[in-house]
Amino acid sequence: MAAGLRKSVEAINGTPLPHGILNTPCTDVRDVADEHELLGVEWLALGCCPVRSWTDPCGDESPGEESPGDESGAPGTKEFCRPETEHAEPITLYAGAECSTIGWSYAEAREHAEATLALGEQQGLEAAFWRQKLTRDAVDLTPAEGPLSVAQGVAVLEGCLAESYGGVGVLHVPAGAAALLGCCDLARENTATGGLSTLTGNCVIIGAGYSAENTGPGGTPADPGTAWLYITGPLVVRRGPSVTIPDRPGPSVNIRNNDRRVLVERTYVVGTTCTVCAVQVEVCP
């Protein structure tokens, strides 16, 4: 059928994946208006210092009788941990719509750009967090012999997290490897919250943006038939309001070519704590 005879209808709406970084109950998503929080944040790490057991060297001496400032190293001395300052940098995502002014109004261009960001912000944020945090800070636990099975990889990652953090963490899984979590019953859905968790209790994020990246520490691309999995402490996402540029029709038009451009952007700050571990797994053995 000739293009001129086709009837124009509304766009096909989509739905972001239910277990992505913004939709899962694993993530604490906070909509903030304070622009200072959107420039980056820092905090004292909590839960990264170990809680140790103390043995009374005398057997019958009260633990409270020693000086809290004693650094002699003698038997019974208690160790102190200085919490580290952690930080998270801003991530700005945008979607731009470009069209001819003939047949497409400013309102239509704006609506299209805003809908594009709403649908794609989760995927975009996952990809950016993967590049800017996971691949930069992770400890690679892949053995010299090569990639592990998915079950072995999850076990190694959860062990890594447990050694440095005593709370619930987050397992980050590319969408392309997610189906293999069901092979060994590695993730289960909480019927009350709809979230996924492992047998250990760690949350699971399945990311389309993770699958688009699928790189290891340092940005190393995954070998064919493999995928990278990561684990972190809990996540807090600070999300600012979306901003539409320009906010009125006139400035959206380029008078040189009569094209219209509308941009929508939003800033996020994604924080996690204590440790990041990575492992390469086989998805096509």
For the regions a protein language model found, what residue spans apply to each?
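Short N-terminal signal/transit or membrane-insertion segments
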Residues: 1-34, 104-106, 110, 249-252, ...
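Assembly/oligomerization interface modules of large self-assembling protein complexes
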Residues: 2-91
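The N-terminal extracellular segments of secreted preproproteins, especially immediately downstream
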Residues: 25, 47-48, 57, 80, ...
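Long, contiguous amphipathic alpha-helices that act as assembly "spine/axial" helices in icosahedral shell
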Residues: 83-142
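A generic structural signal for short, non-catalytic loop/turn and secondary-structure boundary residues
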Residues: 84-88, 164-166, 255
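Generic detector of well-ordered alpha-helical segments enriched in charged/polar residues
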Residues: 114, 122, 126, 130, ...
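Extended, solvent-exposed, turn-rich assembly/linker loops in the middle of proteins
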Residues: 138-203
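Sequence/fold signature of self-assembling virion shell proteins
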Residues: 194-285
